[in-house]
UniProtKB/Swiss-Prot annotation:
Domain of life according to the entry: Bacteria
Keywords: Cytoplasm, Hydrolase, Nuclease, Ribosome biogenesis
Entry GO CC: cytosol
Any one GO molecular function term: nuclease activity
Statement: the UniProt record of this protein carries the keyword DNA repair: no
Sequence similarity: Belongs to the YqgF nuclease family.
Taxonomic lineage from the root: Bacteria, Bacillati, Bacillota, Clostridia, Moorellales
Entry protein name: Putative pre-16S rRNA nuclease
PANTHER family in alphabetical order: POLYNUCLEOTIDYL TRANSFERASE, RIBONUCLEASE H-LIKE SUPERFAMILY PROTEIN (PTHR33317:SF4)
Length: 140
């Protein structure tokens, strides 16, 4: 079963995809945000092309666990996405995923320009892999 992970930001959406068995996550692409209709259409096409059956959206919580304005915006986007694609949408706590992604990219010695191009994909990969690992631990 293919699962898609999303890191939804104000300017871009990082996209990751699981392998067909749902064990590992890999970065797929970064979508430059334009407007809601275009963003949903781009994601719907990826869902169709890769046979995605579930979506996982990173939920940006504050360090104390509360939800701020960005989390509410992500939840609203996820509601629109679920209505558009008709698939289950799950949330996964994304605290510090972008920080972790940035560290990995720095250690990989990528240029600043290249890091900016892929950081959202890598963050989406962290989100999705965390979700897949949790599924595996729960035996689902």
């Amino acid at each position: 079963m293919r699962i898609m992970g999303l890191d939804v930001g104000t300017k871009t959406i990082g996209v990751a995809l699981s392998d067909p068995l749902g064990w590992t996550a890999q970065g797929l692409t970064t979508i430059r945000r334009r407007n809601l209709a275009a963003d949903l259409a781009a994601l719907k096409e990826l869902v169709r092309r890769y046979g995605v059956e579930e979506l996982v959206v990173g939920l940006p919580r504050n360090m104390n666990g509360s939800l701020g304005p960005q989390a509410e915006a992500v939840r609203a986007f996820a509601r629109h996405l679920q209505a558009e694609v008709g698939l289950p949408v799950h949330f996964f706590d994304e605290r510090l995923t972008t920080v972790a992604a940035g560290r990995v990219l720095l250690e990989a010695d990528l240029s600043r320009r290249r890091r900016r191009q892929v950081i959202d994909q890598v963050a989406a990969t962290y989100i999705l892999q965390g979700y897949l690992d949790r599924l595996g631990q729960n035996g689902v």
